[in-house]
């Protein structure tokens, strides 16, 4: 008897997804646990494993199909010897969803441009045998290279006056529409991840009252400790500590001290989190994902570093599970490696805070009334004012600065 392969729900909130790719073709033998397809969710590409054994008799939903509802029929397995008519009858009985192949229908076609629209021009004819204009209007027209034939006078008997020249704008009807050569650009359809990013960040900027606080941190001691740790573990590359690892740990410790910054907004109540779960923004080919370091405040720097490396690798390979990127109470976005000094990040709802981290650089500072050189890192907190008041945001940044500038406090 034919066996249904259904669109899986990869998270409790998932209602539909994109069937990105089939890894098996019709007629192939399929074993339990074997990866047969890839499903694109709003944050990652997930593998679909076969549960049953059989022959992949029919692919109902082709690859590159969008918005496939959960639990809809995407393929059929059959046993040896089953007839094609039986398979077709089984599909007709069980399939109520039509595939939605990915298309560029909403994108402009390369050869469609506004130059193809018939140009309609209204020509206004004037009697130019004699033009009446004031001397000042004539001087202004000459200075501005304006032809009197194009100007309608508002003075007595149509006389052109100063104000007519000052208020004159060329008719748009005579401006030739310039078309772009379709070879000057390329069209890339928006994948599901990009659409979700656009939707969520637009919603955030439109509905969340952002405010921003910045602070400077001296990272000289942190860099010294990092160098000592990496020298000690020089033979084991997997334990190499990054500055970002220290930043994550410092945020975790600061949230432990200022728990009111570890919260999210709800219409009826503010949710304060007991766990310190930190989302870390990671750039991938298709956009951005935020894998989560859970209970970050309970981990030492080596544990946190190893876990972060594993999460980044899975993110780059599109192998994150929903549990690894859904949730989190606070986000870190670090653009320091690109030389960015500071920036205001957009809050990732329903979280109430995101911290943008800039590059470390040598600067002149005043210490004990003396000018000296220090390595300074700028960080900017974007906070939801419905949840986090200015004083709470300031307390958090002060606590973060304390741990960054005295890193030994994070290690004991």
From Swiss-Prot:
The record describes how the cofactor is bound as: Binds 1 lipoyl cofactor covalently.
What keywords appear on the UniProt entry?
Answer: Acyltransferase, Lipoyl, Transferase
| SUPFAM superfamilies given in the database record | CoA-dependent acyltransferases, Peripheral subunit-binding domain of 2-oxo acid dehydrogenase complex, Single hybrid motif
Give every Peripheral subunit-binding (PSBD) domain span. Answer: 132-169
What residue stretches are annotated with the Lipoyl-binding domain? Answer: 2-78
Listed GO CC annotations? pyruvate dehydrogenase complex
**Does the keyword section mention Magnesium?**
no
Q: Which residues carry this modification: N6-lipoyllysine?
A: 43
Q: Which cofactor does it need?
A: (R)-lipoate
Q: Which residues form the active site?
A: 385
Which GO BP terms apply? pyruvate decarboxylation to acetyl-CoA
| NCBIfam families tied to this protein | PDHac_trf_mito
Function field: The pyruvate dehydrogenase complex catalyzes the overall conversion of pyruvate to acetyl-CoA and CO(2). It contains multiple copies of three enzymatic components: pyruvate dehydrogenase (E1), dihydrolipoamide acetyltransferase (E2) and lipoamide dehydrogenase (E3).
This chain's protein is named: Dihydrolipoyllysine-residue acetyltransferase component of pyruvate dehydrogenase complex
Name the source organism.
Rickettsia conorii (strain ATCC VR-613 / Malish 7)
Q: What is the lineage of its organism?
A: Bacteria, Pseudomonadati, Pseudomonadota, Alphaproteobacteria, Rickettsiales
**Which gene is transcribed and translated to give this protein?**
pdhC
């Amino acid at each position: 008897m034919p066996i249904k392969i259904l669109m899986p729900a990869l998270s409790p909130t998932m209602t539909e997804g994109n069937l990105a790719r089939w890894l098996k073709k019709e007629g192939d033998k399929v074993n339990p646990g074997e990866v047969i397809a890839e499903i694109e969710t709003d944050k990652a590409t997930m593998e679909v494993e076969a549960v049953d054994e059989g022959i992949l008799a029919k692919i109902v939903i082709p690859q590159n199909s969008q918005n496939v509802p959960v639990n809809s029929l995407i393929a059929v397995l059959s046993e040896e010897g089953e007839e094609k008519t039986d398979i077709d009858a089984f599909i007709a009985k069980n399939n109520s969803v039509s595939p939605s192949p990915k298309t560029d229908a909403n994108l402009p076609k390369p050869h469609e441009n506004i130059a193809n629209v018939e140009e309609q021009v209204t020509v206004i004819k004037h009697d130019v045998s004699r033009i009446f204009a004031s001397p000042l209007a004539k001087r202004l027209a000459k200075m501005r290279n304006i032809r009197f034939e194009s100007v309608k006078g508002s003075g007595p008997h149509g006389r052109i006056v100063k104000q007519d020249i000052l208020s004159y704008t060329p008719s748009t009807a005579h401006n030739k529409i310039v078309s772009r050569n379709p070879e000057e650009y390329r069209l890339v359809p928006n994948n599901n991840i990009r659409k979700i990013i656009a939707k969520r960040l637009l919603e955030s900027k439109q509905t969340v009252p952002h405010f921003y606080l910045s602070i400077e941190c001296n990272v000289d001691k942190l860099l010294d400790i990092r160098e000592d740790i990496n020298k000690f573990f020089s033979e084991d590359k997997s334990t190499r500590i990054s500055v970002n690892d220290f930043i994550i740990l410092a945020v975790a410790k600061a949230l432990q001290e200022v728990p009111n910054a570890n919260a999210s907004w709800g219409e009826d109540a503010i949710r304060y989190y007991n766990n310190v779960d930190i989302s870390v923004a990671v750039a991938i080919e298709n956009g951005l994902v935020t894998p989560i370091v859970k209970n970050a405040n309970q981990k030492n720097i080596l544990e946190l570093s190893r876990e972060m490396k594993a999460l980044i690798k899975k993110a780059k390979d599109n192998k994150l599970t929903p549990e690894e990127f859904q949730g989190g109470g606070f986000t870190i976005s670090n653009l320091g490696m690109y030389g960015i000094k500071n920036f205001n990040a957009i809050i990732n709802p329903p979280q109430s805070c995101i911290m943008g981290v800039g590059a470390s650089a040598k600067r002149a500072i005043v210490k004990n009334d003396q000018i000296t050189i220090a390595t300074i890192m700028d960080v900017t907190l974007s906070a939801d004012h419905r949840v986090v008041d200015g004083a709470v945001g300031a307390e958090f940044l002060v606590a973060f600065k304390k741990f960054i500038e005295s890193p030994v406090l994070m290690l004991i």
